[in-house]
A protein has these predicted regions:
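Thiamine diphosphate
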Residues: 1-4, 86-189
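Residue-level recognition of short, well-ordered coil/turn positions
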Residues: 6-7, 137
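Conformationally flexible catalytic loops at phosphate/diphosphate-handling active centers
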Residues: 8-104
Length: 189
């Protein structure tokens, strides 16, 4: 997705779990990885990188009159990125039998209360949701898989139409802010 979309990615994990757990992992064969890789996009990426044979100036100082023009020029890349990520999630799903989406819903199909979260809290929330639904509650969880760029339409598609209340669990605390980043995105959506 990063190479085809021409936008850098940050993959983040919950540090405590990563440093305190032992888990088995499945490693893909190189042939499987090759199927996932768009070699035309890789070639375009390599042709665009810095090269002494094709000198170019990047990262130079800009004044305000040109900075915002360049800043706005990259919007098209970010706007196209969710569809590219969905395309690759589809390829991974087909290969591994998973069901990754930008926003995955878990819980009662007629949930009245829904949690929206990302990260390891989702595993704990699933256990609680199973318990509560088994005892007559109607609750669910939306797991955020791609946080930025945030696709409000995909979030709304993931929330059951029966939902009356939403709780956003955010791992960030920004003192003095009106709300945390994920919460503000959900409210805006």
């Amino acid at each position: 997705s990063a190479i085809k979309g021409r936008v850098p990615f940050i993959n983040f994990f919950d540090g405590f779990r990563t440093s305190h757990e032992i888990q088995k992992i499945a490693i893909w064969d190189y042939d499987d990885l090759k199927e996932m890789c768009d070699m035309d996009a890789v070639a375009a990426f390599r042709n665009h990188c810095l090269n002494p044979e094709r000198p170019a100036m990047r990262g130079s100082h800009e004044n305000g009159d040109t900075f915002f023009q360049h800043r706005e020029a990259c919007n098209g890349y970010y706007d196209a990125l969710p569809e590219i990520v969905e395309e690759y999630m589809g390829k991974v799903n087909a290969k591994l039998g998973t069901d990754y989406k930008l926003f995955n819903y878990y819980g009662a199909p007629d949930a009245e209360r829904v949690i929206i979260a990302m990260g390891s809290i989702c595993d704990v929330a699933e256990e609680v949701i199973d318990y509560m639904n088994a005892h007559g509650e109607k609750v669910g969880l939306v797991k955020v898989r791609l946080y930025r760029p945030f696709r409000a339409d995909r979030l709304l598609e993931a929330i059951p139409a029966t939902c009356k209340k939403i709780a956003v669990l955010d791992r960030t605390k920004e003192p003095g802010a009106l709300g945390e980043p994920l919460y503000l995105d959900v409210v805006t959506a």
